[in-house]
């Protein structure tokens, strides 16, 4: 299964706030610069790359010198507005250093749920990729709401990245997080925690092993990553969860090395076997 990853042509890379930001709330420019280098090199190699990036609120908090993440929706959305602009400025600068053009794509759940607008998103992403542009996707946190009558929020970018991977029929979703993979117990408190190399089915037992929220500047936790993995597997797609502290790990993944946790259903493996 890992060996087949070498043939992946269309990739979705998801990077979380914990990878983009230091724990003290400052922007991790070194990691972002490395990420831009890796994705640019993949483009040079002939791969198609889509980046799903969190961080608008975290970067906004830094830009506005806020010590903690706001709690009210208007404040969060105002901070996201500032942060998204700053985040794209940083990405444009770093990707530009490697000769790449990036394009911003901000989505809300109603857009990808409604057939006509969903098709429009698919066409837009295809057009960007065909022009050699790297789409940078984020939820439109400035306008997204979560109400009973009108839900437009995805809840987190883990699910958004899985939805994008399905929309563009990506060969692989690589989720960069602050953990090396999916463990049987919490590796921060259990030194003997064992990491799963591959998971073929999200069982109640697997779900029970996940718990807790993400960083103070982000929203995701292991449960949201499992939900994204489940979405991918139901769509007959593959996802790898790994640590994003050194984005060059993506090169190792693309060489078929045993990095992180691979989520892939058995039926995906069977369909792959039939085509080879």
From Swiss-Prot:
One of its GO terms (cellular component) is cytosol. Pathway: Amino-acid biosynthesis; L-proline biosynthesis; L-glutamate 5-semialdehyde from L-glutamate: step 1/2. It is found in: Cytoplasm. ATP binds at residues 14, 177-178, 219-225. The keyword Cytoplasm applies. GO terms for molecular function: ATP binding; glutamate 5-kinase activity. Its main location: cytoplasm. GO terms for biological process: L-proline biosynthetic process. The keyword Amino-acid biosynthesis applies. Its EC number is 2.7.2.11. It catalyses: L-glutamate + ATP = L-glutamyl 5-phosphate + ADP. PANTHER family: GLUTAMATE 5-KINASE (PTHR43654), ISOPENTENYL PHOSPHATE KINASE (PTHR43654:SF1). Belongs to the glutamate 5-kinase family. Catalyzes the transfer of a phosphate group to glutamate to form L-glutamate 5-phosphate. This is Glutamate 5-kinase.
